[in-house]
């Protein structure tokens, strides 16, 4: 059993926010609201040889099932992630 994933803070770059809108029709704030301080997230860890360790998290955004890629960020308070992307299915 994987331990629960808690996202206390989500870092979203301008480039990622623009990509979400242009490629996937999602607003970064919608993605943020689906994950930050939300319990019971379904996820799996993936260690990609090129991109490193990341969490692949399932969520529903605007009624669409999505997979969101989160990268752990070194932070003294912990539970901080950078948004990689979000893929509606």
Residue ranges of predicted features:
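Ribonuclease/tRNase effector modules and their secretory precursors
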Residues: 1-89
């Amino acid at each position: 059993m994987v331990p629960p994933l808690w996202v206390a803070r989500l870092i979203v770059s301008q480039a990622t926010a623009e990509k979400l809108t242009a490629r996937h029709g999602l607003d970064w704030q919608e993605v943020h609201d689906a994950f930050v301080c939300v319990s019971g997230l379904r996820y799996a860890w993936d260690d990609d040889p090129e991109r490193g360790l990341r969490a692949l998290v399932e969520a529903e955004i605007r009624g669409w099932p999505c997979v969101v890629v989160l990268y752990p960020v070194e932070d003294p308070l912990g539970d901080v992630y950078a948004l990689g992307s979000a893929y509606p299915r």
